[in-house]
Amino acid sequence: MSSVKRLDINYKTDELFEDFRNFGNKDLYLVDELRGEMIDASSDSPFYGIYVGDCLGARMALYRKGEVEETHFPGFDDYNVIWKLEVLRDFQGRGYGTSLLDFAKDQGLPIKVIARNQSKDFFIKQGFTDLEETNRDGHDVLVWTP
């Protein structure tokens, strides 16, 4: 299993995210999220990643209920939200996305996820249930329960 690391909120992390901006999906950039967190330096980092050598090959933003969009998730008092999860193309198919999800599942809380970039089948394969709803941007909403 790959080692998931919490990413610091600083300009070095912004530099590490550069490869994702250059080669990744524009819906998953995390630019606004990172810069917003840098403004509030007192907050804990919601960003996690997997390094492959010196390269950040995979990353996710894992938030607690109330920190991001709360719609489409009735019936849960406390939960986490995987706001965005991305593995660079050169590192796909190596289990890094699954490792990030396993890390989130190990928190022991239900997880809500917005399936962007045709990732719905991946999340279903990982045990998520399709709520058969979409968010305001038209992305599918899925949930995992412990």
UniProtKB/Swiss-Prot annotation:
What species is this protein from?
Staphylococcus saprophyticus subsp. saprophyticus (strain ATCC 15305 / DSM 20229 / NCIMB 8711 / NCTC 7292 / S-41)
Name the UniProt key words of this record, in alphabetical order.
Answer: Acyltransferase, Transferase
The protein depicted here goes by the name: Uncharacterized N-acetyltransferase SSP1595
Under InterPro entries, the record lists: Acyl_CoA_acyltransferase, GNAT_dom, YlbP
Residues covered by the N-acetyltransferase domain: 7-146
Pfam families according to UniProt: Acetyltransf_7
Among HAMAP family, the record links this protein to: Acetyltransf_YlbP
Instruction: Output the Gene Ontology terms for molecular function.
Output: acyltransferase activity, transferring groups other than amino-acyl groups
Question: Recorded E.C. number(s)?
Answer: 2.3.1.-
Give the domain of life.
Bacteria
CDD domains, A to Z: NAT_SF
